[in-house]
Design a protein with these regions (language model features):
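Alpha/beta-hydrolase fold catalytic core
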Residues: 1-37, 59-61, 275, 281-289
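Active-site loop/oxyanion-hole signature of alpha/beta-hydrolase fold enzymes
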Residues: 23, 28-29, 52-55, 65-107
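The conserved beta1-alpha1 loop
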Residues: 38-42, 235
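Serine-hydrolase catalytic-loop signature spanning alpha/beta hydrolases and amidase-signature enzymes
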Residues: 42-52, 63
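Conserved hydrolase catalytic core segment
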Residues: 102-141
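Conserved alpha/beta-hydrolase catalytic His-Asp/Glu region
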Residues: 158-210
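Conserved serine/cysteine hydrolase catalytic core
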Residues: 192-249
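Catalytic histidine-centered segment of alpha/beta-hydrolase-like enzymes
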Residues: 265-275
Length: 289
């Protein structure tokens, strides 16, 4: 079984320099220059969310999974107002430069998809294939409220079992998983801090999220319509963030995404079950043939 290598890259913000940690899964096929797949997580998650997907894809691809600023191994930002798409996008551009690749595939869950969509909308961007995991140019107010209810609470527990229980509650939208699957979802979401377990992200990421949520719906259709690369849209059939109408519209305009829905799943598909990994793998195979 392949294992990731922990690396870092130094990025800049208006407040100074910060390190972004990322996980590199070397390609196992022996190719001298395998295609690169960059996987970017959701709001409170981190790069280890993609372990199951990355392990499979690393048989044919070099897979890179960053912890965005304020999450996992990455530095916290001095100015919490910078926890927003423009800074994340700038950090990812720096990371892509470090990777020394001209073209890559992007797999983005929720926030990670918004970052990918933003980059793919720009001229001369490096994205050759885009996977948007349960996210689009219009986000449902219901889903945003649900996320806002827990993102800034920063709970802590005295046992990992309590962490698992809490994870099952807030991540119920990920769908049904066995015990091993829930452990994968919780293992890197929590970190031991003395006698307690705490979430592995800066609770201040909630501050700009709350401010944006209070400004009303934001349409990102101009960004989506500017995307030109092949695009796969994955949607949980019970998603409270990406509604059916928006998903359908995404198949009719812009890159005309291919839509795959997963029954019994809300926001968002975890990319742990085999059918979800199969969908990504098949799409990338077609794009890189």
């Amino acid at each position: 079984m392949n294992s990731p290598i922990a690396r870092t890259v130094t990025c800049a913000s208006p407040s100074g320099l910060h390190r972004i940690g990322y996980w590199e899964w070397p390609c196992q096929s022996g190719q001298s220059q395998p295609p690169t797949v960059l996987c970017v997580h959701g709001l409170t998650r981190n790069g280890r969310d993609f372990d199951a997907l990355a392990e499979r894809l690393s048989h044919q691809y070099r897979v890179i999974c960053p912890d965005m600023a304020g999450r996992g191994r990455s530095d916290r930002l001095a100015n919490s107002a910078l926890y927003a798409i423009p800074q994340y996008l700038a950090d990812c551009v720096t990371l892509v430069a470090r990777l020394d690749v001209e073209r890559l595939a992007w797999v983005g869950t929720s926030m990670g998809g918004l970052i990918g969509m933003s980059l793919a909308s720009l001229q001369a961007n490096p994205i050759a294939a885009l996977v948007l995991n349960d996210v689009g140019p219009i986000l449902s107010a219901e889903g945003l409220r649900r996320i806002g209810d827990y993102v800034g609470k920063a709970p802590s527990f005295d046992s990992y079992e309590a962490c698992l229980s809490y994870t099952r509650t807030i991540a119920a939208g990920f769908g049904s998983h066995d015990d091993a699957g829930w452990d994968m979802l919780a293992r890197h979401y929590w970190v031991r801090d003395g006698a307690r377990w705490r979430v592995h992200y800066d609770p201040r990421i909630a501050e700009p999220f709350a401010a944006a949520g209070g400004s009303g719906p934001l349409s990102l259709w101009p960004l989506y319509d500017a995307v030109a690369c092949p695009t796969l849209l994955m949607r949980g059939a019970r998603s409270d963030l990406l509604d059916v109408a928006t998903a359908h519209d995404m198949t009719q305009r812009g890159p005309r995404a291919r839509l795959i829905e997963f029954a019994g799943v809300g926001h968002a598909p975890s990319l742990i079950p085999d059918p979800q990994i199969d969908a990504v793998e098949q799409f990338l195979k077609e794009c890189f043939q």
